[in-house]
């Protein structure tokens, strides 16, 4: 940081402030995590200098023999982790991985059956404000009002009625195990392809703590951060027979040069995911989520679906007469970072919401376990009970900071 602070103190100070925020606060945003020093070193390496349009062994630039090594390592490790024939590690994000799949198997105007964003889906699963909702005809399924779980009967009925070309499974705010085999059976019945977006649960899948979609889906996409604990980026997994088309849709279809420094960092993270400690880490993520959910439930909070099977929980604050926006602000003042989130059958604007989403990957990476979740849960309950009590929120913030600074950002 010395050289950066000397050359550009404005940017350098912003980074230092962010280090302080991450170190002194509790990160409970379910889609965020902390990476190892090795991953950061790969991402900050001289590979950022290199243009490498194309794929290993078939580039449009010279001098790619060493970045080819890095990309091939990433591909082979991804295939080993997830037991698949094909992996494309070039997508810059999960959204671009999804776009690559859509362009590989759909034409503009084709029908997609995806999960409603307010029920836990994702923007790229057909939201009208996203490219997926602009280019394609989208039909949405959701969760059952009584259980908060995916309504598979509704999925099947909508599939039979609308005959989608593609069914999209996967979510950004769904706390329960997804039945990928059932989705595939529905897709086969109506002649649709199945894409699973496992961005949130990829790390759990890699470690065996969530059933894998790879054997059921025609296409599987993911981010490489979140529970997979790598750099921010995307990836597509499939069978070898889909490889040529998928490759061409990523490059030259929607991207130019791949980010070779990020791909190298992906390779490092995938190497970490193949180690025994990664499986232990993922178990702790799930155990911590269950412990935190237990604290909140005992305090009278309503969790969508009644709990969690994975790394996240969705807290419906309707009965507490607190909006998601107000809860997010109060928790931030208390040193706890979350995001406001819509809940199924939402009545408020997405800028206000009735819920917050909480996740345990980042705190688990710092070395926290179930005992620490008891403390964290207590602070969450206290802060939400005192959203307008600035004095108490400041007191909680001081307690949180003293606690948080006992843990490194990366303990695994």
UniProtKB/Swiss-Prot annotation:
Which UniProt key words apply to this protein? Amino-acid biosynthesis, Cytoplasm, One-carbon metabolism, Pyridoxal phosphate, Transferase
Work out whether the entry's keyword set contains Heme. no
Checking InterPro entries in the record gives: PyrdxlP-dep_Trfase, PyrdxlP-dep_Trfase_major, PyrdxlP-dep_Trfase_small, Ser_HO-MeTrfase, Ser_HO-MeTrfase-like, Ser_HO-MeTrfase_PLP_BS, SHMT-like_dom
Its annotated compartments are: Cytoplasm
Q: Which top-rank group of organisms is this from? A: Bacteria
Q: Which cofactor does it need?
A: pyridoxal 5'-phosphate
Marked site (Plays an important role in substrate specificity) residue numbers = 225
Q: Which residues carry this modification: N6-(pyridoxal phosphate)lysine?
A: 226
Q: Which GO terms describe its biological process?
A: glycine biosynthetic process from serine; tetrahydrofolate interconversion
Q: Indicate the enzyme's highest-level EC class.
A: transferase
Residue positions binding (6S)-5,6,7,8-tetrahydrofolate: 117, 121-123, 349-351
Chemical reaction(s) catalysed: (6R)-5,10-methylene-5,6,7,8-tetrahydrofolate + glycine + H2O = (6S)-5,6,7,8-tetrahydrofolate + L-serine
* Quaternary structure and partners: Homodimer.
> Hey, which family's this protein in?
Belongs to the SHMT family.
Know the name of this protein? Serine hydroxymethyltransferase
Gene that specifies this protein: glyA
């Amino acid at each position: 940081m010395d050289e950066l602070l000397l050359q550009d103190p404005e940017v350098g100070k912003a980074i230092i402030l962010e280090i302080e925020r991450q170190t002194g606060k509790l990160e409970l945003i379910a889609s965020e995590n902390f990476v190892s020093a090795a991953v950061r070193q790969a991402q900050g390496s001289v590979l950022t200098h290199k243009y490498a349009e194309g794929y290993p062994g078939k580039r449009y630039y010279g001098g790619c023999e060493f970045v080819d090594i890095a990309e091939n390592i990433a591909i082979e490790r991804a295939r080993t982790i997830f037991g698949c024939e094909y992996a494309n590690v070039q997508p810059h994000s999960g959204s671009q991985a999804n776009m690559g799949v859509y362009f590989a198997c759909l034409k503009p105007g084709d029908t997609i059956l995806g999960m409603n964003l307010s029920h836990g889906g994702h923007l790229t699963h057909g939201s009208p404000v996203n490219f997926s909702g602009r280019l394609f005809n989208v039909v949405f399924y959701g969760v059952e009002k009584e259980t908060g779980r995916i309504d598979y009967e509704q999925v099947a009925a909508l599939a039979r009625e609308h005959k989608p070309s593609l069914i999209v499974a996967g979510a950004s705010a769904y706390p329960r195990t997804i039945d990928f085999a059932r989705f595939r059976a529905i897709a086969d019945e109506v002649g649709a392809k199945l894409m699973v977006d496992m961005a949130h649960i990829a790390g759990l899948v890699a470690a065996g703590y969530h059933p894998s979609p790879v054997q059921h889906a025609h296409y599987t996409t993911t981010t490489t951060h979140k529970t997979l604990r790598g750099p921010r980026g995307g990836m597509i997994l499939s069978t070898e027979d889909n490889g040529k088309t998928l490759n061409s849709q990523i490059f030259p279809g929607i991207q130019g040069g791949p980010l070779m420094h990020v791909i190298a960092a992906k390779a490092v993270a995938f190497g970490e995911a193949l180690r025994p400690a990664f499986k232990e880490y993922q178990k702790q993520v799930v155990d911590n989520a269950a412990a935190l959910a237990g604290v909140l439930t005992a305090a009278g909070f309503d969790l969508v679906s009644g709990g969690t099977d994975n790394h996240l929980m969705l807290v419906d604050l309707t009965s507490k007469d607190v909006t998601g926006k107000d809860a997010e602000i109060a928790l931030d003042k208390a040193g706890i970072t979350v995001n406001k989130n819509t809940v199924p059958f939402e009545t408020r604007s997405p800028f206000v919401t009735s819920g917050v989403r909480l996740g345990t990957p980042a705190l688990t990476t710092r070395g926290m376990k179930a005992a620490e979740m008891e403390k964290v849960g207590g602070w969450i309950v206290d802060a939400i009970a005192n959203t307008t009590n600035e004095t108490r929120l400041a007191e909680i913030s001081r307690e949180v900071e003293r606690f948080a600074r006992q843990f490194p950002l990366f303990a695994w």
